[in-house]
Design a protein with these regions (language model features):
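Conserved RNase H-like, two-metal-ion catalytic cores of nucleic-acid enzymes
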Residues: 1-84, 88
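Alpha-helix initiation and N-capping motif
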Residues: 31, 68, 79-83, 139-140, ...
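Hydrophobic alpha-helical scaffolding
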Residues: 41, 75-76, 113-116, 177, ...
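Short, hydrophobic/amphipathic alpha-helical patches that form generic packing surfaces
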Residues: 71-73, 125, 190
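Acidic, Mg2+-coordinating catalytic module of metal-dependent nucleases/exonucleases
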Residues: 94-159, 185-188
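Conserved alpha/beta core segments of nucleic-acid transaction machinery
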Residues: 152-174
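C-terminal accessory/binding modules appended to enzymatic or scaffolding proteins
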Residues: 169-190
């Protein structure tokens, strides 16, 4: 399945929380309590379709969404990664040195945690500015439809492959390696 190793969360007027969903789920966390606490608040994500399936798997259920990547595309930005959008709107250059890190590693080093926290630190301000621009461009209703569609698509039950071990992360890299596939299958079945 899709496993999220870190959830970064910030609520306006509050600090940033970095949550380990794997450890919390193993410890019996009741994600319904989290959903109730968040309520109808809009979740601001960048590239929501990367995160929503993993959220759905553990029981996180956003009710409203603003996706800064979708907004950037609708606004015609030529580059729509979070770093590019942040630089465009806020003039801040986000360091991306840990973007390819193995986020399953524990404990997370302090500089990784700082890196992860900075990603969400900018989202509320980005949403405010991007909503203004969407409205000015007459694209706010279109954006709302796109966000709603992304939310439904991202939280929809995933169609699982009938062969469970083929869900192993990055298994497609072994598609032309029969020996590697056999080893992966063997490890899955142990």
């Amino acid at each position: 399945g899709h496993e999220d190793w870190l959830i970064q969360f910030k609520r306006e007027g509050a600090g940033i929380a970095l949550l380990d969903p794997v450890a919390l789920t193993r410890a019996g966390a009741d994600w319904n309590e989290f959903n109730d606490a968040v309520g109808d608040a809009t979740w601001i994500l960048h590239d929501s379709l990367m995160d929503l399936p993993g959220f759905a798997e553990i029981g996180l259920k956003p009710k409203a969404l603003f996706d800064t990547e979708i907004a950037a595309r609708l606004l015609g930005l030529h580059r729509f990664g979070l770093a590019a959008v942040t630089e465009h709107y806020l003039g801040i250059t986000l360091a991306k040195e840990h973007s390819a890190a193995d986020w399953s590693y524990r404990p997370l080093p302090r500089d990784w945690r700082n890196y992860a926290a900075l990603d969400v630190e900018v989202l509320i301000e980005l949403e405010t500015m991007m909503r203004r621009d969407l409205k000015a461009a007459g694209k706010d209703e279109w954006a709302a439809e796109e966000f709603s569609h992304a939310l439904v698509a991202g939280l929809a039950p995933r169609k699982l492959h009938p062969i469970p071990w083929l869900h192993i992360s990055r298994i497609t890299q072994l598609s032309r390696d029969p020996r590697g596939l056999a080893i992966a299958k063997s490890l899955w079945e142990e």
